A protein has these predicted regions:
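A short, Lys/Arg-rich alpha-helix, primarily the initiator
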Residues: 1-23
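Helix-turn-helix DNA-binding elements, focusing on the entry/boundary residues of the two helices
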Residues: 17, 28, 39, 54-57
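DNA major-groove recognition helix of helix-turn-helix/homeodomain DNA-binding modules
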Residues: 53-70
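Short alpha-helical DNA-recognition segment
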Residues: 25-44
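The alpha-helix within a helix-turn-helix
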Residues: 21, 32, 61
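Short, charged recognition helix plus adjacent turn
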Residues: 2, 72-105
Length: 105
């Protein structure tokens, strides 16, 4: 489901950042040591409690050695899948096997 408000966006981005950091076996303290980011700021962002700029996300992605788009792909994966399903539904309409049989009769 697409984010309902700005807070939902922050939460999804924060969850993605935390997930990627943990996959890399890094702690918040590790990130702090690798950057100028304060541990408390990282924690707030990962919990969706603080807004971030695109520049901040790009810098953070560089620290994690990932492409910045990975953050957004993770954060909005479910939304992208839902949009794809909606496009398929719009393209194929309400196809049922019965409607195909009706056309062949």
């Amino acid at each position: 489901m697409p984010p309902k408000n700005e807070k939902d966006l922050y939460i999804k981005i924060g969850e993605a950042l935390k997930s990627i950091r943990k996959e890399k076996n890094l702690t918040i303290t590790d990130i702090h040591a690798m950057s100028e980011f304060h541990s408390s700021t990282i924690s707030l962002i990962e919990r969706g409690k603080q807004n971030v700029s695109i520049g901040w996300l790009i810098h953070y992605a560089n620290i994690l050695e990932i492409d910045p788009t990975e953050i957004f792909l993770r954060a909005f994966k479910d939304d992208f899948q839902e949009m794809q399903l909606q496009k398929m539904y719009e393209r194929f309409g309400t196809y049922t096997p019965e409607s195909d049989n009706d056309e062949n009769s």
